[in-house]
Design a protein with these regions (language model features):
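Active-site loops and adjacent core secondary-structure elements that bind or stabilize anionic groups
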Residues: 232-318
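Hydrophobic mid-bilayer segments of alpha-helices in multi-pass membrane transport proteins
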Residues: 10-19, 27-48, 70-76, 220-224, ...
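Membrane-embedded alpha-helical segments and adjacent helix-loop junctions characteristic
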Residues: 56-138, 147, 370-457
Length: 530
């Protein structure tokens, strides 16, 4: 038991090192991730008995998996730099003023509704890398823009990306009975609806302060109820499309709301960014449709490809992958052998859509005369300079996650929590999902990692598994707010790389509190037989 306890404490070390360096020492994400990786390697070898070959393969898997994230960062920065170079952001700000002079509603429209829409169809950090620069272009401070997009995308991390994370969960557990499946959907969507409603109110507060919350409370509650109830109802019929459909309806509805007399009076942001001189001479000739053109093209290409199975399957048949042998530690933790590990389909990857949108945007702006001489050189230079440190951090984080997973550290950490807590485990069940997403930056990966574990705990405690499974994926969705790799995407595109610790410090307490509340609700459901 003492050895097991020592193993459990050892699993905490890489996570604690990462958090302390980010939050207390104010290290950048690349430095903190490298240190966390180093400690995970040492513990894998010394405590868990992983061989050099096994650990090396785990690092290689992490590096390969990180490529799918880096392939989102660079093209997203291309779009941002193209829009900045052309002066499109100045036009977007002016166009949003015509939509409504209420800047708080503008932020809600982009940072809550539009970001949620992007999560519904794309995911993989795209809502953050697209939404943050748009908000900055509208006058929001970079740090605030990152916080807003992290909040806005959270609720869509289970049924967004065409239900990918939900599919990951049900692939690991037994929800074959239709009644059990329906109960799981109701539990999950009810909690996600609350997450979304709270996020909307917080975004109103970040944009407009206490007055922003008070002035927009009715609008946020109505839209939140529409999204929450709509997602629940549609998910019972089609989990794949439920988030995308309600997000699309909400996107149309908020533009109708913006035309109401109530929102025709000017309202300023609570703490706006300072105005900066930009390419306003060129941008002033541009119309709002041209300014949004790269983003509109991104939406169209993503919808056409991802919602059309014939196109998606045709383009998705070309995949890149590596084969990896299975290994085991001295303690008996085994990894699977893969003939094709984590296949990357480049033509249906979010990065391909972003890159294509950036290229089309550049060509159009160049033809329209909005790109100055030397524009391409500046765009590529700025994009590469921002991508490199972000890529180092992402590689470090994903390699650390994979080393901990494959050498048994993550499993021991979760099992230790369940063994120690026993009957009060339901209180902590959302935190397991949160931990999985924090470690992997993906609710899909979290559900695959811990979905069956939650089911086994329910069996061990002889309790209903449905609330625990809902807690798993809802906790994972909340975890997307504090996921280091996702935060890195935001700080990179917002131009505040190195402030990842500050971002985490702003959202960590709220994420933990929300998980604690849901944990209490789930615990109460067992006590009172809900």
């Amino acid at each position: 038991m003492s050895i097991q306890l020592g193993q459990w404490f050892a699993t905490l070390v890489p996570i604690l090192v990462l958090l302390v360096l980010l939050l207390h020492c104010k290290w950048g994400g690349d430095e903190a991730a490298s240190a966390g990786l180093l400690f995970s390697l040492l513990i894998a070898y010394v405590v868990f008995g992983g061989g050099i070959d096994m650990i090396a393969l785990a690092v290689a898997k992490g590096m390969w998996y990180s490529l799918s994230i880096v392939l989102v960062v660079f093209p997203a920065l291309i779009i941002y730099e193209v829009s900045r170079e052309s002066g499109a952001f100045a036009v977007i700000r002016e166009g949003m003023q015509r939509f409504t002079p209420d800047k708080v509603l503008q932020v809600l429209a982009v940072g809550w509704i539009f970001v949620g829409f992007l999560q519904g169809i794309t995911g993989f950090g795209v809502p953050v890398v697209v939404g943050a620069p748009l908000l900055i272009g509208m006058g929001v401070k970079p740090l605030t823009a990152v916080l807003i997009t992290l909040l806005g995308q959270a609720w869509g991390n289970t049924f967004g990306t065409l239900g990918l994370a939900w599919d990951g969960l049900i692939s690991q557990v037994d929800l074959s009975d239709s009644l059990t499946m329906s109960r799981a959907i109701i539990w999950t969507t009810a909690m996600l609806g609350i997450v979304n409603l709270i996020a909307g109110l917080l975004i109103a507060g970040l944009a407009g302060g206490a007055r922003g919350v008070k002035r927009n409370a009715v609008t946020v509650i109505l839209l939140g109820l529409l999204q929450g109830a709509g997602q629940m109802g549609i998910a019972l019929l089609n989990p794949m499309l439920c988030n995308f459909i309600v997000a699309s309806l909400s996107l149309g509805l908020i533009f109708v709301i913006g035309r109401l007399d109530y929102y025709r009076q000017p309202v300023e942001l609570f703490d706006p960014a300072e105005e900066k001189a930009g390419n306003t001479t060129v941008g002033s000739k541009m119309n709002i449709q041209q300014a949004f053109m790269p983003y509109l093209f991104l939406i169209v290409i993503a919808v056409v490809v991802l919602l059309n199975d014939s196109i998606k399957n045709y383009l998705g048949q070309w995949k890149l992958s590596f084969a990896f042998a299975g290994k085991s530690t001295i303690l008996g933790f085994e990894t699977h052998s893969y003939s094709a590990y984590a296949p990357l389909a480049p033509l249906t990857h979010s990065g391909a859509f972003l890159l294509l949108a950036g290229i089309v945007g550049y060509i159009c702006y160049l033809q329209w005369g909005y790109i100055q001489a030397g524009g391409m050189k500046r765009i590529l230079k700025n994009s590469l300079n921002k991508t490199i440190p972000s890529a180092i951090a992402v590689i470090g984080l994903t390699a650390m996650s994979k080393v901990m997973d494959e050498t048994g550290q993550t499993t021991v950490l979760a099992q230790g929590v369940a063994a120690v807590t026993g009957g009060i485990y339901p209180l902590l069940s959302p935190f397991i999902g949160l931990l999985g997403t924090f470690m992997t930056s993906s609710n899909l990966s979290s559900n695959i990692l811990f979905g069956s574990f939650q089911q086994k705990v329910a069996l061990m405690l002889q309790i209903d598994k449905v609330p625990l499974l809902a807690a798993q994926t809802v906790g994972g969705a909340i975890g997307s707010i504090i996921a280091p790799s996702k935060i890195l995407l935001g700080t990179t595109t917002a131009g505040i790389l190195g402030q990842e610790g500050l971002v985490i410090s702003k959202v960590l307490g709220g994420a933990l509190l929300l998980c604690a509340i849901f944990g209490a609700v789930i615990f109460a459901s067992y006590q009172f037989g809900w």
